[in-house]
Amino acid sequence: MLLAIDVGNTNTTLGVYEGAVLRKHWRVETSHTRTYDEYGILLRQLFASAGLEPARVSSVVIASVVPPLAFTLEQMCVRYFDRKPMFVGPGMKTGMPILYENPREVGADRVVNAVAAFERWRCALVVVDFGTATTFDVISAKGEYLGGAICPGIGISMDALARSASKLPRVEFAKPPSVVGKNTVASIQAGLVYGYVGMVDGICAQIAAELATPPKVVATGGLAPLIAGVSRSITEVDEHLTLEGLRILHERNR
């Protein structure tokens, strides 16, 4: 079995693959203070709850945008799975030309998403990932990574609004009954949901105008289904795109 780990600034997503089949997946908080023992015990508990045997893990692959956690995660893998993990980074065989001024600047998660999306759809693409930051990654019809855009994430915007506007409460990120809110909570939700939908559709329209081929727009991340349900540009949602990309990259670099 393959253990795939996607470490984001806010959440860490884990998946267990048997061949090309995702057997189980979890989302946990990314913690800078957990020790490798605490991470190891947490994973063993998750495996036990799913009826999975840690001893059956033959490989581990990790994409992380939190460099300080690299040593902790490596030690966790070695001590609790007896496996040295493969980290996504410069020098890895991606099968995708990275046409960025400095390819080393491209986050591991963005490369992983791009590889997974092109492997599945084989066409010009925009991958929108709703994480701590909302990222747009553009892939050409030839399978080249062209670049993209980075925006503040939905959670960051919600936190900033609640922190900076003392009379505005923190609200659940949910689609309101109408874009015209009839109370404070609904008004904030309307601004967040339709504001982000407008941003996504606007940026994707600008990207399409610059490309020779109209791109398919794919969304991933925990909030992708909600935004996709309102967006005019998003045509596909794959919440496990990053995990699938990790599986593909592991296969290409074994």
From Swiss-Prot:
Entry's InterPro entries?
ATPase_NBD, Type_III_PanK
Could you tell me what the cofactor note in this record states? A monovalent cation. Ammonium or potassium.
Q: Name one GO molecular function term.
A: ATP binding
Identify the keywords attached in UniProt to this record, alphabetized: ATP-binding, Coenzyme A biosynthesis, Cytoplasm, Kinase, Metal-binding, Nucleotide-binding, Potassium, Transferase
Cofactor(s) for this UniProt protein:
NH4(+); K(+)
| Chain residues that bind K(+) | D129
- Report the active site residues: D109
Q: Which Gene Ontology terms describe the biological processes this protein takes part in?
A: coenzyme A biosynthetic process
Membrane-crossing segments per the record? none
Q: Which reaction does it catalyse?
A: (R)-pantothenate + ATP = (R)-4'-phosphopantothenate + ADP + H(+)
Q: Which residues bind ATP?
A: D6, V7, G8, N9, T10, N11, T12, T13, T132
Gene Ontology CC annotations of this record:
cytoplasm
Key word Ribonucleoprotein present in the record? no
Identify the residues that bind substrate.
Y100, G107, A108, D109, R110, T184
Record's subcellular location: Cytoplasm
Enzyme type, top EC level: transferase
Task: State its Enzyme Commission number(s).
Answer: 2.7.1.33
> Under which pathway is this protein filed?
Cofactor biosynthesis; coenzyme A biosynthesis; CoA from (R)-pantothenate: step 1/5
Report the CDD domains cross-referenced here: ASKHA_NBD_PanK-III (cd24015)
Question: Could you tell me what this protein does?
Answer: Catalyzes the phosphorylation of pantothenate (Pan), the first step in CoA biosynthesis.
Q: Which family does it belong to?
A: Belongs to the type III pantothenate kinase family.
Quaternary structure (record) = Homodimer.
What name has this protein been given in UniProt? Type III pantothenate kinase
Which source organism?
A: Anaeromyxobacter dehalogenans (strain 2CP-C)
User: Gene encoding it?
Assistant: coaX
